[in-house]
Amino acid sequence: MKKLKELTSLLFLFCCLCFCLILFPQTARAGSLTPTAQDNLKVRLRRTSDLIPVSGGYMRVFHQKNSVGVEYYDNDLKIRSKRKINMELPLWGGFYAGSDGYYLVEGQTNNKENDSAEVIRVIRYDTNWNRNGAAAITSNPELFGGEIRTPFDYGCVEMTESNGKLYVVTGHEGYVDSSVGQGHQGFLMAEIDQATMKGKIVSCDLWHSFAQYIKSHGSYLYVLEQSEGSRCTKLSRYDSNTLDCTTIELLPYGGSHTSVWALACYASVDGMAVSSDSVLCVGTSIDQSKYDKVSENTPHNLYLSVTPMSDFSEKATTTRKLTNFTGEGKSFAGVKITKINDNRFMISWEEYVSDDNKKNSSANDPLSSSTLHYLFVDGKGKSLSKEFTTAAPISDCQPVVKDSRVVYYASNSNTLNFYSINSDNGKADKKTYHIAGDNATWNFKNGILTISGYGPLSIS
């Protein structure tokens, strides 16, 4: 009750100060700079937030309504500069830091079902964010599933490079099927020649692809996919020279198709990474042998599958559970796998907890009510550590590695936390920004709320 009263008082004071600061703006202090608030606590198929190691620190990239925010931080995660890149098309796809610059993927709907209409644009920038090329992707009616009505539909937007080509995997909705009154959803992979910036669709289907990830290693591309239509989580290997494809089943789903409509999978596909000799994939699932008896008490568990590159087969693939819940309808708010080096990976997750059962957050850190779980495995998926926990949420941001630290950020509308985990011993630290507006910060200590900065407040 005391905590509730403190937070209620805090909100009341925020509202009062918002009115005061609008009427009586203060003068900005020299050198003051405030990060941009962006709620990224929900883990999405299409990431809206990225963090990239750069010389001297980190670059934060995040999607806003019609633009992309870019902020630079030093190695101590102190903000140094910020800018905005206007989007060229209305649909956000994703961001990728390539070997030859930065890429933004954007799109637009094709409701007129015009085969020659641009539906996806892959825009390249140099490392100073000067635009220096773009590839236009159109439908390819010669391929099954190559007709695009809505790009990115119920899909990720993930990218990798191989042999001078950029590959993008995502989902899409095809042209309307008159027999059902809507288009079917499926997998889509596009290839962009980085020298000419010419792009095309190279693989696609209409088999209800609900998550897609891609990595490259040697002469192969590895694609992890949640294929509801195939009733399994599947892993495909493409020869990057010929695009010949071999696919194996990692996790079969229960149920069977009796119509064109999607069936529940009771599973998620959350990420993949490659070591020097194996492909590691993470996801969650119920016990699929109990599919027909699923209830609100049926738990999900976190699993890790490992497929050796030298024997790319279902028989050689091993799968093990990383959690062992048996009831209470346990589920997950998000799962990530982060490559530290070829023989060390961090798997992190947050278990779903109802608002009624969450622990109280501190008044000075609204994000501290969540619990992040993480552990380390080697390149063959064997455990290297115990399971660690820290007061932090999972977020939309994929963790990155710099100077033996795994770093990511989480943010709501008024707090931005950078979390840093020592990749050797698992110790976690954080740096917090309290954001009260574009040029204002807040702090709550000893029952006193302090607002610093100038201009209007933005409080949610």
Task: Locate the predicted segments by residue.
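Positively charged n-region of N-terminal signal peptides that target proteins for export
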Residues: 1-6
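Sec-dependent signal peptide cleavage junction
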Residues: 21-32
